[in-house]
């Protein structure tokens, strides 16, 4: 039977979610043409399924379908099982009132957003609701980043509610940020009435088209009867597989209209069961078991293994706990990505801290010399691999000799072999697959790997992260020193301390010099690198964790982009603590201009406002510190102050973030701090800028 790829994908998705119903349907399904599968490279890919426990029940299926975790813009998501049960509870309610009730059913406690004409029916319905809190930012971008911070700190999806046109387009940056960083977020935006769509009506924007590349899924609700189903789908898709943002477009006539009839409790979609599905699931499980066995063999054989842990570990249930079990059992050192910080206790002897462009030198060396790299929930981002042709030569050589290689545990099939070719690939939830792997891993002590740890210890001694210019020039504060002091002050409360950052040098210094011990405590923009992320994300994190200490460590340039959200913190008494490292420049860009553009500082210096006066004008307490001897005292004031507070720190200028791997280089070709090199660098800077800088 001939059919389109769209129909094929839909039938396969439905088949995966339906129990066997009739022999007629089975025979019909078996007559369908088989869809050719894409061939991958030498990596063996096995899909983790609900059979992780070793048993398969044909009457139980994962919800939503595994197809939801695969991106196909031509296939609408299929959720729920078709039933004849209807729900009469929404009859007589407006679309806005249905929205309110659906938020309650989804367990939503907080919403971030900004009102406008096209979304007023919803705002009217939630007016004075006692069931959840509404946080009103000063800009829709702030609402999006607040929702991201909320989601990152809580593990629950952040919810955004904005109007049409500019209200919707202002949320695009947070959605793209959430997509790249795997943050669950559900965005509801108003839209002009369906009768006006396409007429260039006031504040009309094709937000479904605009947001298609920056969401996991989006939809316009075209009639009130489908509103509950679409809301359910949105929350399911945002939180399953690799989390991400979804968008639901709500025309005004839908939210203002009244439902006149009962609606199905779930999506009423046709069912087409397939007898081949159980066979396929059994085959996948057998392939998974075989792949796990091969991975265990590589782990047991490896002499110099290293675990590279990404955010997938943190997002997986019990991921950090299982990571620790694997590391302890086989005595394998662990390095983490920027977004994986906190997934492994950095006070553990086996910790290598962060890897990558600004990672520790010893983590980068371990990645280059390891004979086996176990990648857990990491996608081999370019800031991790740098020059791919020079990446992991030790593991590649071991793979060629069948004694090691690169093992990738990844939830998204499309990320397998996307950047780096994997020797073995395990597709599925990291935690579920680690549970399958652990029983097959042989115990090893650090003494059994003494040669490997001797190398690592030598690298740690030669290139410690604490190696930077601590002598303050002209009595100026070093940012690294301040962050280390903050880490020390929070040493006994790390589990309840959440740090957010903007993007720039301060972000990397925070990653390097704060000691991370618990998951979800580092909240930053990694994939998109969104300046201005820190303050609104901190507000969202504090809303999610009201009893925790939430500190935004920001740079002056990044802070300038969203500082108006201080007013939000003041209005709602959200007790975030803000540290602004003020060097009056766009530090990360000036670092590149210094190293690679002969100190031509093109438009990277700005005149800042008086941050303390701004804080005072917005009703927030503020202090400024410029004396290195007052760092501890000032930080203690910030921590102890009730409500939101701001500490401006006047820091040294032109301080580089080191270690650093220049673009185009291998991980082992890093620049580290050297006192003589620092003197030469500053002297050359003064010469090139006629004494203006340096």
Swiss-Prot record:
Query: Could you identify this protein by its name?
Result: Acetolactate synthase catalytic subunit, mitochondrial
Q: Which UniProt keywords apply?
A: Amino-acid biosynthesis, Branched-chain amino acid biosynthesis, FAD, Flavoprotein, Magnesium, Metal-binding, Mitochondrion, Thiamine pyrophosphate, Transferase, Transit peptide
Which positions are annotated as binding thiamine diphosphate? Answer: 140
What does this protein do, in the record's words?
A: Acetolactate synthase catalytic subunit, mitochondrial; part of the gene cluster that mediates the biosynthesis of chlorflavonin, a fungal flavonoid with acetolactate synthase inhibitory activity. Is not direcly involved in chlorflavonin biosynthesis but acts as a self-resistant protein that effectively confers chlorflavonin resistance to the native host. As a catalytic subunit of mitochondrial acetolactate synthase, catalyzes the first of a series of common steps in the biosynthesis of the branched-chain amino acids.
**Which cofactor is essential here?**
Mg(2+); thiamine diphosphate
| Pfam families for the chain | TPP_enzyme_C, TPP_enzyme_M, TPP_enzyme_N
Gene Ontology CC: acetolactate synthase complex; mitochondrion
Predominant localisation class: mitochondrion
Q: Which domain of life is it from?
A: Eukaryota
* Binding-site positions, Mg(2+): 556, 583, 585
Q: Which InterPro entries match?
A: Acetolactate_synth_lsu, AHAS_TPP, DHS-like_NAD/FAD-binding_dom, THDP-binding, Thiamin_PyroP_enz_cen_dom, Thiamin_PyroP_enz_TPP-bd_dom, TPP-bd_CS, TPP_enz
**What residue spans carry the Polar residues bias annotation?**
59-69
Q: Where is this region: Thiamine pyrophosphate binding?
A: 505-585
Q: Where in the cell is it found?
A: Mitochondrion
Species this protein is from: Aspergillus candidus
């Amino acid at each position: 039977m001939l059919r389109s790829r769209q129909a094929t994908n839909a039938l396969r998705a439905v088949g995966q979610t339906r129990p066997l119903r009739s022999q007629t349907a089975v025979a019909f399904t078996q007559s369908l043409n088989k869809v050719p599968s894409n061939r991958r490279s030498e990596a063996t890919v096995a899909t983790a399924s609900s059979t992780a426990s070793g048993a398969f029940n044909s009457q139980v299926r994962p919800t939503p379908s595994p197809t939801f975790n695969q991106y196909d813009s031509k296939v609408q998501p299929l959720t729920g099982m078709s039933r004849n049960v209807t729900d009469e509870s929404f009859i007589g309610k407006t679309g806005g009132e249905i929205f309110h009730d659906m938020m309650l059913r989804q367990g939503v406690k907080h919403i971030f957003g900004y009102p406008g004409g096209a979304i007023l029916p919803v705002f009217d319905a939630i007016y004075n609701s006692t069931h959840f809190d509404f946080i009103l930012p000063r800009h829709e971008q702030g609402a999006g980043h607040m929702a991201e911070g909320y989601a990152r700190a809580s593990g629950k999806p952040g919810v955004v509610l904005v109007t049409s046109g500019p209200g919707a387009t202002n949320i695009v940056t947070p959605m793209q940020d959430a997509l790249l960083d795997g943050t669950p977020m559900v965005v509801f935006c108003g839209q002009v009435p369906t009768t006006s769509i396409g007429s260039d009506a006031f504040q009309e924007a094709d937000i479904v088209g605009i947001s298609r590349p920056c969401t996991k899924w989006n939809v316009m609700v075209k009639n009130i009867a489908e509103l509950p189903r679409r809301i359910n789908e949105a929350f399911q898709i945002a939180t399953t597989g690799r989390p991400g943002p979804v968008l639901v477009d709500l025309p005004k006539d839908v939210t203002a209209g009244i439902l006149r009839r009962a609606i199905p409790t779930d999506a009423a979609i046709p069912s087409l069961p397939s007898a081949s599905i159980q066979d396929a699931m059994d085959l996948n499980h057998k392939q998974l078991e075989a792949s796990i066995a091969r991975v265990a063999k590589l782990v047991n054989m490896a002499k110099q293994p290293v675990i590279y842990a990404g955010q997938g570990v943190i997002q997986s249930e019990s991921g950090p706990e299982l990571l620790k079990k694997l590391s302890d059992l086989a005595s394998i050192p662990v390095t983490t990505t920027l977004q994986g910080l906190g997934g492994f206790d950095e006070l553990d002897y086996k910790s290598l801290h962060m890897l990558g462009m600004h990672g520790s030198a010893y983590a980068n060396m371990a990645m280059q010399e390891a004979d086996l790299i176990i990648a857990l929930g990491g996608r081999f981002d370019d800031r991790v691999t740098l020059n791919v042709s020079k990446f992991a030569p030790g593991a590649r050589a071991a793979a060629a000799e069948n004694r090691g290689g690169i093992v990738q545990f990844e939830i998204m099939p499309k990320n397998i072999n996307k950047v780096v070719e994997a020797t073995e690939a395990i597709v599925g939830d990291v935690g579920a697959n680690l549970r399958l792997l652990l029983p097959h891993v042989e115990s090893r002590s650090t003494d059994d790997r003494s040669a490997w740890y001797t190398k690592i210890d030598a690298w740690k001694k030669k290139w410690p992260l604490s190696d930077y210019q601590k002598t303050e020039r002209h009595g100026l504060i070093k940012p690294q020193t301040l962050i280390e002091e903050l880490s020390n002050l929070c040493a006994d409360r790390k589990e309840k301390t959440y740090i957010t950052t903007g993007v720039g040098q301060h972000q990397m210094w925070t990653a390097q010099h704060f000691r991370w011990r618990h998951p979800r405590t580092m909240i930053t923009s990694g994939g998109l690198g969104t300046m201005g992320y820190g303050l609104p994300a901190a507000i969202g994190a504090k809303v999610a964790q009201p009893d925790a200490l939430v500190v935004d460590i920001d740079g002056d340039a990044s802070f300038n982009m969203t500082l108006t959200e201080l007013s939000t913190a003041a209005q709602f008494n959200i007790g975030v603590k803000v540290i602004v490292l003020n060097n009056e420049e766009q530090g990360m860009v000036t670092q590149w201009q210094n190293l690679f553009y002969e100190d031509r500082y093109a438009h990277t210096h700005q005149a800042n406002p008086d941050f303390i006066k701004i804080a005072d004008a917005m009703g927030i307490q503020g202090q400024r510190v410029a004396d290195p001897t007052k760092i501890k005292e000032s930080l203690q004031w910030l921590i102890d102050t009730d409500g939101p507070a701001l500490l401006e720190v006047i820091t040294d200028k032109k301080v580089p973030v080191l270690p650093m791997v220049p673009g185009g280089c291998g991980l082992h070709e890093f620049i580290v701090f050297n006192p003589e090199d620092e003197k030469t660098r500053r002297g050359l800077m003064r010469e090139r800028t006629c004494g203006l800088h340096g």
